[in-house]
């Protein structure tokens, strides 16, 4: 049996803990030897069963559990635990339905937040409906990766479906903005669990060289859900009420639950009590992560919007966030026996580079999703439905990019070159969006978002394959969940920072352009952005120009984030599959 990394005799406490975990891992694998659930998968394939029997444990038997070697031609252990194409085809539709709904719920607020803000009279605070979803999604995704190890893939996925459905129902029945924010947080927990668990499950049943293709398919359906979120939410908001957009998801998620329950048959764990398994969860790390994500988001939401950046509250939140994140890293490295984000993964060069790429391109992507509807609803005076439709070219580009990235990996076995090129492409596309408001060519409203989406879609697929290829097999579930942690952190900051940039720059420009106190004007604009078109004609154009300039700064920020991802992608090791 291949042993995990051996440590020097002069190890610190954290290294000792990791060695102890590795020893326990070897013992558990030895006990599973000869009775592996991976063997049952191969037997089920031979018997031509039409259900996917997937190992509930992510840890491979002897020859499969190994740390990534320096050789670029590491044996693909996953090829030993695949199921037939027929079996995958039975399971995949049930998984994809959940992916579509999670993606739809992720973007449904993008085209409805003006309606929600107007109904509750709190436009400046309505961005919390998006950030609350992302906070909970971010904080709990690593936990779902650990749940997959402890309770198994199927139970974890079904639990995520239940939490998501409850959250959607509460969203549709909320009677105040803060009730809606709390409901969005509940939905975010389930949505994050659905996304990460599906990727972990597919990683178990698909060979490494084909994972790019299957991940591309998953990303396409995620893109379909994302593209539907804006138009569907905008349509219901314009024609009926924004609440229907949330309530309609409840019966659909129930269908997904039933499909997974009946089509995904998995071997059972050895019988261990719930509390025995629960004690394995890194609660200290989880609490620190929740505090870090929440305080960081609060700081960027309040700063430049409700409070000045030098306000003691904003500064305190930034300090608290920094301390929480540093403490989280310390706990994961030196305290946690079963860490949410293992250091064996975080310290691997390709994994870390890919994680940073995921973070930066997620910041860029959600900054884009925030900025585009704002541009069309404020500058172009379009309705929520039409501004949501404007997001479709970007989503189509992302879908095609995911398939292209997977196809290139399957054909060439190389993922670095196309990753580097995709981020450069996205950065340039975002720069061209600075022409918005000055150009009279309507095709530019589609081509630039499509190009940026294409680059983003390629990178989402290729970086995940890089992480799977580079991570130790025993920690693959945690490695995948950690990638979603970095993505979700980026999504939270993408919305919050973009909103803060627009609000801050708008205030600066208006104070320079107008010769009266603009605080009341800013107050009205923050409550309802469409107020700009009800202003007196003599100041309306001045305010529109200031608003356009502030949105351009958010697009410039998007371009810079893509460039940061481009730089990080240069450090990914070029291992051919």
UniProtKB/Swiss-Prot annotation:
Keyword tRNA-binding among UniProt keywords: no
Sequence segments annotated as region (Disordered): 1-80
Ranges of biased composition (kind: Basic and acidic residues): 40-62
GO cellular component: cytoplasm; fungal-type vacuole; fungal-type vacuole membrane
PROSITE patterns: MFS
Keyword Transport set for record: yes
Pfam annotation, one family: MFS_1
Molecular function terms from GO: basic amino acid transmembrane transporter activity; L-asparagine transmembrane transporter activity; L-isoleucine transmembrane transporter activity; L-lysine transmembrane transporter activity
Record keywords, A-Z: Membrane, Transmembrane, Transmembrane helix, Transport, Vacuole
Membrane topology annotation: Multi-pass membrane protein
Localization (cell): Vacuole; Membrane
InterPro entries, sorted: MFS, MFS_dom, MFS_trans_sf
Listed GO biological process terms: asparagine transmembrane import into vacuole; basic amino acid transport; isoleucine transmembrane transport; L-lysine transmembrane import into vacuole; transmembrane transport
Compositionally biased region (Polar residues): 1-14
Signal sequence, start to end: none
Compositionally biased residues, Low complexity: 22-39
Transmembrane segments annotated in the record for this chain: 91-111, 123-145, 157-177, 186-206, 217-237, 244-264, 286-306, 317-337, 356-376, 391-411, 418-438, 448-468, 490-510, 547-567
Family: Belongs to the major facilitator superfamily.
Role of this protein: MFS-type transporter involved in vacuolar amino acid uptake.
Protein name, per record: Vacuolar membrane amino acid uptake transporter fnx2
Protein species of origin: Schizosaccharomyces pombe (strain 972 / ATCC 24843) (Fission yeast)
Phylogenetic lineage: Eukaryota, Fungi, Dikarya, Ascomycota, Taphrinomycotina
Gene: fnx2
């Amino acid at each position: 049996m291949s042993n995990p990394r051996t440590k020097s005799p002069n190890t610190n406490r954290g290294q000792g803990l990791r060695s102890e975990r590795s020893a326990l891992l070897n013992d558990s694998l030895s006990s599973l030897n000869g009775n592996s659930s991976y063997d049952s998968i191969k037997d089920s394939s031979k018997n031509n069963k039409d259900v996917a029997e997937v190992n509930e444990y992510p840890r491979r038997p002897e020859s499969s559990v190994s740390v990534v070697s320096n050789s670029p031609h590491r044996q693909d252990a996953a090829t030993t635990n695949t199921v037939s194409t027929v079996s995958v085809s039975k399971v995949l539709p049930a998984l994809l339905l959940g992916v579509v709904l999670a993606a739809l719920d992720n973007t449904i607020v993008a085209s409805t937040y003006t309606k929600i803000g107007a109904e509750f009279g709190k436009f400046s605070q309505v961005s919390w409906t998006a950030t609350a979803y992302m906070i909970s999604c971010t904080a709990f995704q690593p936990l779902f990766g650990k749940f997959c190890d402890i309770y198994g893939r199927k139970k974890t996925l079904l639990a995520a479906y239940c939490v998501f459905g409850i959250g959607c129902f509460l969203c549709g029945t909320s009677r105040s903005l803060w009730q809606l924010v709390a409901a969005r947080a509940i939905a975010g927990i389930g949505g994050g669990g659905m996304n990460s668990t599906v990727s972990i499950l597919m990683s178990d049943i698909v060979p490494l060289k084909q994972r790019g293709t299957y991940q591309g398919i998953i990303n396409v359906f995620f893109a379909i859900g994302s593209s539907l979120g804006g138009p569907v939410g905008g349509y219901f908001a314009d024609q009926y009420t924004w609440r229907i957009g949330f309530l309609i998801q409840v019966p659909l998620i129930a269908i997904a639950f039933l499909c997974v329950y009946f089509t995904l048959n998995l071997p059972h764990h050895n019988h261990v009590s719930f509390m025995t398994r629960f004690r394995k969860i890194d609660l200290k790390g989880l609490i620190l992560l929740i505090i870090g994500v929440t305080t960081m988001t609060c700081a960027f939401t309040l700063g430049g919007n409700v409070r000045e950046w030098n306000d003691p509250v904003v500064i305190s939140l930034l300090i608290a966030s920094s301390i929480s994140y540093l403490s989280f890293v310390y706990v994961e490295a030196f305290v946690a026996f079963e860490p949410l984000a293992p250091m064996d993964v975080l310290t691997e060069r390709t994994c870390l580079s890919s994680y940073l790429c995921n973070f930066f391109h997620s910041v860029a992507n959600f900054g884009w999703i925030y900025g585009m509807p704002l541009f069309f609803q404020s500058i172009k005076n379009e309705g929520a439905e039409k501004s949501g439709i404007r997001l479709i070219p970007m989503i189509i580009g992302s879908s095609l990019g995911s398939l292209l990235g997977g196809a290139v990996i399957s054909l060439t076995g190389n993922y670095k070159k196309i990753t580097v090129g995709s981020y450069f492409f996205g950065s340039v596309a975002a720069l061209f969006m600075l022409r918005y408001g000055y150009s009279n060519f309507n095709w530019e409203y589609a081509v630039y978002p499509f190009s940026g989406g294409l680059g983003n879609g390629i990178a989402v697929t290729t970086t995940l394959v890089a992480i799977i290829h580079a991570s130790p097999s025993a920690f693959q579930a945690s490695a995948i969940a950690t990638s979603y942690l970095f993505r979700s952190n980026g999504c939270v900051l993408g919305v919050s920072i973009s909103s803060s940039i627009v609000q801050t720059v708008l205030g600066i420009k208006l104070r320079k352009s107008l010769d009266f106190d603009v605080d009341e004007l800013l107050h009205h604009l923050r409550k309802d952005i469409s107020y700009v078109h009800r202003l007196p004609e003599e100041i309306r154009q001045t305010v529109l120009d200031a608003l356009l300039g502030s949105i351009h700064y958010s697009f410039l920020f998007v371009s810079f984030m893509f460039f940061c991802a481009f730089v990080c992608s240069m450090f990914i090791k070029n291992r051919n599959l």
